[in-house]
Amino acid sequence: MTDDKAVPRTDYKLESDSELRFEIENKNEKVTVVLLNGQAELFGTELVVKKPYEFVTGAKVAIFTYHGCTIELRGKPDVAYVAKETPMVMYLNANSALEHLRNKAEQEDAQGPIVMVVGPTDVGKTTLCRIFLNYAVRLGRRPIFVDLDVGQGGIAIPGTIGALLVERPAPVAEGFSQQAPLVYHYGHSTPSANSTFYDVLISKLAETTLERLQANKKAKSSGMIINTCGWVKGSGYSHILHTVEAFEVTAIFVLDQERLYNELLRDVKGTVQVVFLPKSGGVVERTKSQRTEARDQRIREYFYGSKMPLFPHSFDVKFSDIKIFKVGSPPLPDSCLPLGMKAEDNYTKLVAVQPGPQLLHHILAVSFAESTDENVIQTNVAGFICVTNVNMDKQVLTVLSPQPRPLPQTILLVSDLQFMDSH
């Protein structure tokens, strides 16, 4: 045990409208934050006075105060400083405008704002979504959070898109409560891997979430907050326009990039509000290896938990008890296609996969589909397993699963994403 007195402690006195920013990069480093007095929040979640909050390697934190406070840091962050220049007041004003629209929707029994946050990579899109969601639930709203970022999404594991009804603020050092999320398997960490399939899933998720909004009066007036990926040029821009249409978006917040802001002003309907917001100076650019590590960490947390450890199950599944598929096959030239079939149909085709050593370490999504007669690619998933061993002699896969056997369904979808289980 480390002697608590040996841990360095630093007090920071923050004036109103300023924030304490710190980062932890060193392996196995922990930093504890304690609000000694005043009021402060982390991305819209209020801190409780004298309660310790623990952050670990990889954390990039900005604690903001509207009225002033004193914060104690225990531990050795790689960098820690107080910033007086912050866009938080602008973000609060944007949220006030959304709240005005929600009040109006509530009075008229109409649909609340459908909000989309866009911008290139590493400008703070996920953070802004979190701030909007936390502020909304603190005011008694129940918005739906939609995450279309297949590389660094916050609802399920990478390689998926999903939606979640948010009923309480996110805990300070964690994400939103993951009760009953609606998740669709995509199977890649970038939309460019299969653009056609990505658009199909966006349309399906939009259709389902808009129906759910209508079915829940509280959610209906609260609306949606949609997070997007950082691909904003070429096909990436086309995906943004497709999302606007599919979700019937009413407001777009563009972070940091004026070119994207002006393109959207030109291309979306006049009824859609397009608003430019600056990124925070605390936003940190991530390297390719940091992104890969973040994806691994998301998958690890899915099986093993973060603060509260989870204990996944390992068991064998017979080849004969499951059907494994992937979505999409290489496109054929038009001259080779059957009559009436288009080249893009290949991108959304269900292709059978024979169990074998090539599946080792791959993530498999467990589809809710009961047979291939259903539209499997547009059916949401129950959860995920990881293949930890393939025994061709016994014709079994050994899998890591969050719940004990048997698998809830037998149709499994292969993801490009892999996870090396080191436990």
UniProtKB/Swiss-Prot annotation:
CDD domains: SIMIBI (cd01983). InterPro entries: Clp1 (IPR028606), Clp1/Grc3 (IPR045116), Clp1_C (IPR010655), Clp1_C_sf (IPR038238), Clp1_N (IPR032324), Clp1_N_sf (IPR038239), CLP1_P (IPR032319), P-loop_NTPase (IPR027417). One of its GO terms (biological process) is mRNA 3'-end processing. Pfam families: Clp1, CLP1_N, CLP1_P. GO terms for cellular component: mRNA cleavage factor complex; nucleus. It is found in: Nucleus. Signal peptide: none annotated. ATP binds at residues 19, 60, 122-127. Its main location: nucleus. It comes from the Eukaryota. Keywords: ATP-binding, mRNA processing, Nucleotide-binding, Nucleus. GO terms for molecular function: ATP binding; polynucleotide 5'-hydroxyl-kinase activity. Belongs to the Clp1 family. Clp1 subfamily. Required for endonucleolytic cleavage during polyadenylation-dependent pre-mRNA 3'-end formation. This is Protein CLP1 homolog. The gene is cbc.
